Amino acid sequence: MRSLRHGFLKLALGAALCVLSDCIFSGCERRPLEDQDFRTRVQVRVNLDGIQNVTCDIYNDKIPVPEIDPEVMHVLFFDENGGAVVTESYISSRETDQDGKTVFRGEVSVAPGSYRMLAYNFGTETTQIRDPYGWETSQAYATAVPESVASKFVTKVPSGEPVVYEPDHLVVAREPDEYIPPHTGVHVIESECRSVVESYYLQIKVDGLQYVSSATAVLSGMSSGNYISLGQRIDDPQSAVCFSLLKSDDKGEPVICAIFNTFGRPEGAENGLEVTFDLRTTDGRTVQKTFDISNLFLSENCIKHHWLLLDEVIKIDPPENPGTGGGFDPSVDDWDDEHHDIDI
């Protein structure tokens, strides 16, 4: 009788242990770990404040300012050492915030971790990007003009210095130390982009402007590009910037002038900055004048406002056969026609 009772107790205890074990293990199996979310939203705010001759420091309000209106942002995430690109995306969804600034928003799929992030406006016409997938080597540069244009200034530009179009403004955001924590839902990265291109106002007086049909300028000794991830100008090699000029006046005096873009003046440059004006007359003549304006870049007007105001005067003699051809239109209403008046 005792042995029967003892066997029954052992059987009951074993059954209880089995039930308890099943509860424990089934409880563990039904609590899966949550996966980390890779969704990240990038918000890039375009800040155009303080760009001389574009959003401030306008010397001549008769001259249209360069347009800065990005439509697409190219966003890249590099590994934390700045090596390989981990992921990239193109974001085009944009809206205007309460301060009137354009904000781009878009999502990328990237694992939590430490990265370097770069974003710039994609699709500029005259500003190109070289080696976009290298953090330290990605650079913006300007498109070279055709040889037929460059040859007109071959004796006016230092040997080996390419003649390029003025670069379009390129807005860049860089985050060299961006950490994405483990998260669920959407992690948000906010950044701000600014232009790596500068705008200057150039002006010279012309006696006999009515006899001029078109005018172009080439400014040599300028920075040739910008390392966009580092925010550093490229001063070696240098380049010469080519741009068109418009007719206007300064307090009633006839002038030719332009707001032009450049990657800037080389750091510490005190000489070698020359501008050549190439004017075509109504009777088919070509008049070229070159001026050293190194000192103008050191003037208060240039340092504070990016104004290059030459005191010199270019004199254009009347045509030998008056009445042929026509000069500049007396207004700047036909800006679109005049702005690209370069023989190609």
Which residues are covered by each model-predicted region?
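Beta-strand-rich domain onsets/edges
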Residues: E29-R39, V188-V197
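Acidic/polar, low-complexity intrinsically disordered N-terminal segments immediately downstream
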Residues: R30-W135, L298-I344
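Tryptophan-paired
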Residues: E71-D131, V212-L298
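Acidic, serine/threonine- and glycine-rich low-complexity intrinsically disordered segments
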Residues: E147-I256
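Sec-dependent bacterial lipoprotein signal peptides
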Residues: M1-G27
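Short, low-hydrophobicity acidic/polar segments
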Residues: T87-R194
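Sterically constrained small-residue positions within well-ordered secondary structures
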Residues: D35-D37, P66, V108, P182, ...
